From Swiss-Prot:
Disruption phenotype: Morpholino knockdown of the protein causes neurodevelopmental abnormalities associated with decreased survival rate. Morphants are characterized by microcephaly, brain hyperexcitability and lower seizure threshold. It is found in: Golgi apparatus, cis-Golgi network; Endoplasmic reticulum. The keyword Transcription regulation does not apply. The keyword Nucleotide-binding does not apply. InterPro entries: NO_sig/Golgi_transp_ligand-bd, TRAPP_component, TRAPPC6/Trs33. This is Trafficking protein particle complex subunit 6b. The gene is trappc6b.
Amino acid sequence: MADEALFQFLHSEIIQYVNSAETGESENGRCVSKLENMGFRVGQGLIERFTKDTPRFKDELDVMKFICKDFWTSVFKKQIDNLRTNHQGIYVLQDNKFRLLTQLSAGKQYLEHAPKFLAFTCGLVRGALSNIGVKSIVTAEVSVMPACKFQVMIQKM
């Protein structure tokens, strides 16, 4: 329980630090980009440790199941609520109570701040997939707080 609170506090402080370094409208995109790059590096390191003793994955779906179950549980203390795919390289991971958004108020005015709180996690997933050998683009969307959807588009090489 304590480590969860520490992670949430550290995450919000990182957002505040990066946001204070970048001010203005055009810098908002730069802030999101920096947060995603931080998450990318952390995701690479975490997945390396988590898959150290894991047998090789059979296919993309196997990798995504690992991300949704084991990886997500290690980072956020719960599994993804829903995983959907079109079997053509697009996966949608849905978390109905995303821990990093639960601290924000559910009002519509806070939806504009949500991308900053999701950028690190997008980078985390992209970095994890990259280190496994899966090139991807990860985006996130929030329609109702604190639920969010992460869309993972696998890029074929």
